[in-house]
Amino acid sequence: MLKSRIIPCLDVKDGRVVKGVNFVDLTDAGDPVEAAIRYDAAGADELCFLDITASSDDRPILLDVVRRTAEACFMPLTVGGGVRTLDDIRALLLAGADKASIMTAAVANRDFVREAAEKFGSQCVVVAIDAKQVRPGRWEIFTHGGRKPTGLDAVDYAREVVALGAGEILLTSMDRDGAKTGFDIPLTKAVTDAVNVPVIASGGVGTLDHLVEGVRDGGASAVLAASIFHFGEFTIAEAKLHMANCGLRMRLDGIV
């Protein structure tokens, strides 16, 4: 059985790490390269770097920041935001990213997922889903930083992109983002039950127990968090040890 992963997330706007609530009210949380170095030293399993306004600003991702981040740390790096073409993915991988996260472009053109998986391998292709509950048991996908409804059912869409070659799903509950009330477990479980690839649960972590719930109750392979780590509420080591003490398999070497 694979070990569960903890993934700090750097939401980057104008070259700075930011954190908000429900995708708005952004607060500065520091320099992305410095943050990456800290998380690498602390024993994070991976790092997620999301340029949160690249799609809505209709501009390319900040490759220089990606390159400097990748050079500074040794853990796997997933990068997303404004990834629209195969050339964008190639540029990210050449800049040092291990995986490219695609969202808006995948919604607009499903073939992009298939083409990316064929060109670079499924292991490089993460499809990000930002979902909001529209009624009990149904979640709709939103794009452009959570501003644009699509009418797409999140669970059906996850199933579809995995069939096309997505190697991982990054699943964010917009309702829970930054709220610190825990993951949307019904959403997470619905998606993990529907696909046979790893799912990263995102949106809502406020306590260490929430991390446990994402894996134990939601079925996630990895849990992503931002606020609790960026602002020093908990360390990566505290999170890993708590999850291990709750019976989850964790990589404990290298934690500080």
Swiss-Prot record:
Gene3D superfamilies: Aldolase class I. GO terms for biological process: L-histidine biosynthetic process. One of its GO terms (molecular function) is lyase activity. The keyword Methyltransferase does not apply. HAMAP family: HisF (MF_01013). It comes from the Bacteria. Coiled coil: none annotated. It catalyses: 5-[(5-phospho-1-deoxy-D-ribulos-1-ylimino)methylamino]-1-(5-phospho-beta-D-ribosyl)imidazole-4-carboxamide + L-glutamine = D-erythro-1-(imidazol-4-yl)glycerol 3-phosphate + 5-amino-1-(5-phospho-beta-D-ribosyl)imidazole-4-carboxamide + L-glutamate + H(+). Transmembrane segments: none annotated. Its EC number is 4.3.2.10. This is Imidazole glycerol phosphate synthase subunit HisF. Pfam families: His_biosynth (PF00977). It is found in: Cytoplasm. Signal peptide: none annotated.
